[in-house]
């Protein structure tokens, strides 16, 4: 976060390189630790668009033409490229290239031009301006080194092995044009609790639209943080756990149960019963309804 924010502050202060994107970053680390989420939150905080490409869709050599447009005489020449058109329409954005290691090596050659000169020419000769783009690429390369040394090895050894995998996956000219390679490590206990609060806050906002107030106990939060987090899989299993234990039960109450007209729910975790328990309270009737009932 500090590396990304420093690049943005230098650009806002007029001290950045005006011929390059605001920043070019490679996020590395295991799955489910927040690499993609950081890009989303960065775009949200800055109030700019997020342009996301899943690079697993660009594993073939001909996929390059989808990004910059097909050459003359080929199908799709009139349509232009997905990448160049997206940046032309939204010149101030966070460009997220997810799982970049899965892309064809030819795509890396295109990114060299973007990172070095802040521009890219499409099939029609139009130049897309990347100078106001924050380029973020994510990769799981190096995650195996982190997992294999999860027990009994020093952090320096893990970091060294991680760097070696990055060097094998990406060419020197590609790595040399990056502003920073940001290594994400496994989430600690405090961060996991914050992730729990984030997921529960999302659920609270969704239920608020249904006129339902929901409250969660600390026992539930600690239970989700302990049993819903997997060091190898990250925070994604926690979302599935919340869906299986809380969301499904609330869905039945919203559609067929006590919460059809709103209400209040208290969600707790019972250590003795080893399960999530719900306390549903019906909504209070309005004063006007009470008056009508008396009449």
Predicted features by range, described:
Residues 1-295:
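AAA+ P-loop NTPase nucleotide-binding core of proteostasis motors
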């Amino acid at each position: 976060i500090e590396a990304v924010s420093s690049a943005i502050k230098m650009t806002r202060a007029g001290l950045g390189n005006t011929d390059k994107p605001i920043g070019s970053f490679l996020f590395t680390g295991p799955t489910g630790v927040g690499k993609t989420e950081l890009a989303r939150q960065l775009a949200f905080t800055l109030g700019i668009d997020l342009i996301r490409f899943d690079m697993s869709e660009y594993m073939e050599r001909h996929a390059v033409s989808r990004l910059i447009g097909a050459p003359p005489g080929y199908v799709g020449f009139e349509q232009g490229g997905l990448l160049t058109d997206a940046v032309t329409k939204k010149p101030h954005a966070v460009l997220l290239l997810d799982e970049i290691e899965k892309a064809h090596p030819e795509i890396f050659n295109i990114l060299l031009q973007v990172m070095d000169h802040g521009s890219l020419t499409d099939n029609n000769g139009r130049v897309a301006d990347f100078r106001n783009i924050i380029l973020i690429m994510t990769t799981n390369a190096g995650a195996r080194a982190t997992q294999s040394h999860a027990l009994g090895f020093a952090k320096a050894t893990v970091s060294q092995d991680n760097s070696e995998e990055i060097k094998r996956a990406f060419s020197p000219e590609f790595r040399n044009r990056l502003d920073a390679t940001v290594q994400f490590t496994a989430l600690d206990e405090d961060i996991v609790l914050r992730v729990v609060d984030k997921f529960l806050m999302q659920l609270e906002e969704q239920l608020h639209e249904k006129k339902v107030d929901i409250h969660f106990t600390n026992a539930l939060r600690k239970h989700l943080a302990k049993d819903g987090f997997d060091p190898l899989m990250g925070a994604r299993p926690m979302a599935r756990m919340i869906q299986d234990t809380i969301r499904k039960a609330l869905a039945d109450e919203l559609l067929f149960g006590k919460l059809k007209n709103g209400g209040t729910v208290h969600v707790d975790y019972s250590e003795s019963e080893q399960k999530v328990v719900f306390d549903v309270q019906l909504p209070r009737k309005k004063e006007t309804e009470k008056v009508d009932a008396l009449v």
